[in-house]
Amino acid sequence: MSSSSSSLLLMMLLLLLLLLTSKLEAIPVLSSTSPSPGVRILRSSESIVAPLDDEVVFECETSLPPERFEWSYSNTSSSSSAISSSFIYLSSVAGKVNISHEYAISRLAIVVRPESLGEYRCVGWFGPLVVTSTIARLDLASISLATKKESHLNWRTAPGNSIIWPCGQQVQANPLASWSFYKNGKEIQPLNHNGTLILNNISSESNGVYSCMATNTASGVRLPIPSSMELHVTKQEGSKSPYLLFGQPTRQSVTTREGQRLLLVCPGVGSPPPIPVWSSPNVTAAVPNKRSKLLSYGLEINPVQVEDAGIYICYLDNGIRPPLELYINVRVEQAPVIVQAPWAGSLTNESDRLQLECQAKGEPKPTIYWLLNGKRSHEVNQSQLLSNGRYLVLKKVLKEHAGYVQCFARNHLGEHSAGTLLQVNPKLVNETDLVVSRPQRPKKLQIMVPPSAPNVTRLSDESVMLRWHVQRNEGLPIQFFKVQYRLINEGKRKMWQTTNENIPYGKPKWNSALGKNFTASVTNLKPQRTYRFRIMAVYSNNDNKESNTSAKFFLQRGSSLEPMPVPELVKIDEYSETAVVLHWRLSDDADEQSITGYYAYYRPSSFAGEYSKATIEGAKARSFHIGSLEVGTIYEFKLQSFSADSASEFSALKQGRTQRSKLTTTEQPIQQKGGDRNVNTTPNHNETYSLNPLLTGTIGGGALLLLLLIAFSFCLCRRKNRNGGDGRNSQNKPRLAELREDFLPLAGGGVPGSKQRQRSRHIHITLNPLDQQQQQPLDEKNTNTNLNSPHLEADPELVYFQRQQQNHPTTYDYDHGQRRLSSSSLRRSQRTLERTPGSNNNLQQIGSETTTTGQRVILKRPRLSSRSENLSSGSLNSVGV
């Protein structure tokens, strides 16, 4: 392998690693909206006017099926704005009413009698939470005359004028009556408005006697009016200024409801016929506008609005002085509407002070009252009303206050309501310390403090999100949590199901002075079913304790729900090496009051597992700090808003990273010569050299790979050179057969009559004749010493050889330059000896023919290790074993 190919391979590997570790941009993900139904009354009952002995049905519908429906009743005599406090609950047992329920709809059927007239409202129970509908009245249909005084009018006027006859002024009807008009006893279809006959551009054909009749639309009762008007249309000589006919008023007062059609008539005749001109001193842009229409006999406003109320002046002018002025006072009534609904936030601590505000508009000004779980505010402990009911103050929030708080605005036109969910975070109850038997040494026993009941939020058609809280306490530490749920149905009671996931408690320190919050999701649920949930905590003593169960939760399908605002993740700031800060916003048309908080999901971008979750309380939050992240790592984030009953779809996916680790080299400040002597050249924070840990590892790995390639190339070159040199020096190497002949075993395997040592610690083997002559005296001395030693014993592993130089003369070339080879060469020689067939047998045969006496006696192990021999060309030198 050449150095150029190694460099090319290294460059390609480095380029590939740099491409893989490059910074990824944020990937936009299309998202849709998700519903948020809420627990509320979808459709309240409407007031009904019915005749006696008729049967009427009140109906109300809730957003979710409640545990039960109830109807309450108050016997009030009028529809005034006064609030009744004497509501009683009705029952079908008495037989006077018939109550039926179907899914989330309840119906109340009742017969109209004097004792059944009054106000009704529907109540839905969702565990401890109670939702109440607005009031619906049941009134008896009626029609009557305000006065029985007869009126017969006789009018004469010139042709071309408009005649306006208020026939229905003396009629009182509930509901409003319908009118029929007659001319000379025959019914006609003229213009009319609320009992007022209008004859436009009269002529001689308009002569006759006119009368009217009122009909009650609910009961069908017809009421003849004892009044009539006889009209004579005659041509008058000369001119006459505008004037009023007998019985026509100069001032009028008109009351109407917002959204209806308003007709202001301007009675008066003249010769020639006058033309009306309209103005108003206190109504801005009253005439003309897009909703007004000028007529020859009046002014029409459709639809009328509250700002149209005021004084209107009609000027009748036909060119002859003086003109006629008519004043009309217009009053526009408006049903109550709540413009600022109360909002209790996500969680209220027990014993805190809570103030809720409710603003409403209407004409007449509505009265405001409050209900907390169906109870009037004066029946609730620690409650107080301020500013005529605009504010509800809970001076000290109690656990019994948890539930649904509703604000009602009421006038004689009806009611309007808005509500908020009040969640109370209870205080930790300090249990009495348990003391052991000896009073002088009281011992506190740690208790198992259970988690709070979970709050349930819908995530999808098959999953929910649970949120719970653990109070700050001194009890046993919690190791992890388990989620349990149970299906609620009408039949057999279902068993609790436990999820497989162990939800870790985390670090044993508190997030705040109040405790720690936790979230977990439950999947594989069935839509259109009702569930209950609870949290089981497992403690350090391996015991467990369950929380209180949640309220019943109906998992509704998303297709039938209204959308909820989806937050937009704007940017992600690198806060520190282990933390980031998320920033988001809502669209301009988003309903912030429908949001309880947000869920933040995050995971490393290179990780395809589950997301970690964090809960952000409060609808007004627009940023959040996420810590305990990895240094210099890219994460992907997404958000979703949630309420007490649902969650939105996820926001678009966005990526961000934590800060890289900083490798800082600090230099001593250098004072500049000349002008400024206090200039500090130490690099500041922004100039600190820092490397991405992943990039640093890549460079280090590349350098290591380069070193390995260089070492590998060097080894190949050394091996190639060694192979070439071995061929040239092969003639100096001894043959194995000749090498075996140099070693002859002693007969009997030992020295007769003498004990041998078990194993010699030093073995000297030499074939060099020069060394042999030098070592022979010393070897003979050592041999005699060993043979005479009483410690020598027979050892089958030891073999004694004697070299027979006289019988087997062998010549070796001696080279001082190659006395010692590497250990690898020795190992190869040893393996060659071991693989030679019959080598040991040949040695033994030769040894048997040799006498036990010789010039040399050498201790030789059967198998030589790499440390025991050094083989050179022509010499075999022994080393210490």
Curated annotation (Swiss-Prot):
Keyword Cell cycle annotated: no
Residue numbers on the Extracellular membrane side: 27-693
Location in or out of the cell: Membrane
Record InterPro entries: FN3_dom, FN3_sf, Ig-like_dom, Ig-like_dom_sf, Ig-like_fold, Ig_sub, Ig_sub2, Immunoglobulin_dom
Region entry Disordered, spans: 655-685, 768-791, 809-881
Domain annotation Ig-like C2-type: ranges: 37-138, 128-228, 242-330, 336-425
Disulfide partners: 60-122, 167-212, 266-314, 358-407
Annotated protein name in UniProt: Interference hedgehog
Provenance organism: Drosophila willistoni
